[in-house]
């Protein structure tokens, strides 16, 4: 049956911690980059307001997912040199075929013993993952396949999956009761997949899911504009973010296909994670996104966005 729900959100680390602690990550991520005047206006009171909006937005996504009650959730994120690295392998597309993925809730640069102890497990739909992997290869998408959900080059080996999954999975499904299919895109390291390739990947996934007798949802996480530790660290390209969100709302896939064709510093760094949203947009086809919220937050170093695609709402 057709994919019945799409979800997307940002996964910048400060999205998941109290605003009182945002300064730690903010100072790490901006390095020596001069900051915009707007950053100084983000007082603790302002940051608390952003944090409240973030939690309300997650609540909307949680409610949509709980109401749909999918049999499986396809989760699309990117690798940050955690699962893969340039000395081993950096695939454009990778899929997890293991029985379960594990992770911990703490951020790798925070020495938080309590959070480090909070290991969680996501059960994976191995049969659906294998079906999608085989089908995508037949549709000329060359996938890397893995059965080991462990980080490679950042932090201790037992941290499990990268933070694109470990931070978002418990927020979306607190009971971790929906079998998942885990899919990685390369969004940081050249050569990068084009926007068209990402949209086509989503369309191919949707075509394969249509042949299944399962209720399936798809979730993309990352972005929007940000450049941690890069030359634009702390700066947010709000016009770009709003343009992308408007195109998603309009289901304007033709416009989105050209997104990364021009060479721009803005497209480098974390902004490339918009590719994960494009996979969802491709999977949802003519269904436009409902934009739940958007915030250009310098102390999160990110354009923070939340959206969902509900075909039933579009009828």
Language-model regions, residue ranges each:
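Flexible, D/E/H-enriched segments
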Residues: 1-70, 90-199, 211, 231-315
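A contiguous pocket-lining binding segment that forms or flanks enzyme active sites
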Residues: 205-207, 215-217, 221, 225-241
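Beta-strand elements within well-structured catalytic alpha/beta cores of enzymes
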Residues: 71-78, 183, 214-224
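Active-site microenvironments of hydrolase-like enzyme catalytic domains
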Residues: 73, 77-98, 225-226
């Amino acid at each position: 049956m057709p994919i019945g729900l799409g979800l997307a959100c940002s996964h910048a680390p400060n999205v998941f911690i109290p605003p009182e602690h945002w300064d730690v990550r903010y100072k790490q991520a901006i390095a020596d980059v001069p900051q915009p005047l707007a950053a100084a206006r983000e007082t603790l009171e302002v940051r608390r307001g952003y944090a409240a909006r973030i939690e309300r937005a997650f609540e909307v996504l949680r409610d949509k997912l709980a109401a749909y009650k999918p049999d499986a959730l396809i989760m699309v994120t990117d690798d940050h040199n955690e699962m893969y690295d340039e000395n081993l392998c950096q695939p454009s597309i990778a899929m997890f075929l293991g029985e379960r993925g594990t992770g911990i809730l703490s951020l790798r640069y925070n020495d938080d013993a309590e959070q480090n102890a909070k290991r969680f497990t996501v059960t994976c739909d191995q049969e659906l993952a294998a079906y999608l992997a085989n089908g995508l290869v037949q549709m000329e998408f060359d996938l890397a396949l893995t059965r080991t959900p462990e980080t490679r080059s950042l932090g201790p080996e037992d941290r499990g999956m990268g933070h694109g999954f470990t931070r978002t999975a418990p927020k979306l499904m607190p009971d971790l009761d929906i079998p998942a299919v885990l899919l990685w895109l390369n969004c940081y390291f050249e050569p990068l997949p084009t926007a068209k390739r990402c949209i086509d990947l989503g369309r191919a996934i949707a075509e394969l899911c249509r042949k299944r007798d399962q209720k399936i949802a798809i979730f993309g996480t990352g972005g929007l504009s940000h450049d941690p530790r890069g030359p634009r660290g702390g700066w947010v390209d709000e016009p770009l973010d709003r343009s992308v969100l408007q195109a998603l709302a309009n289901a304007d896939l033709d416009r989105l296909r050209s997104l990364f064709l021009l060479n721009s510093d803005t497209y480098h760094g974390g902004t490339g994670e918009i590719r994960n949203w494009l996979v969802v947009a491709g999977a949802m086809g003519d269904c436009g996104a409902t934009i739940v919220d958007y915030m250009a937050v310098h102390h999160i170093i990110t354009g923070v966005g939340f959206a969902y695609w509900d075909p039933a709402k579009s009828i």
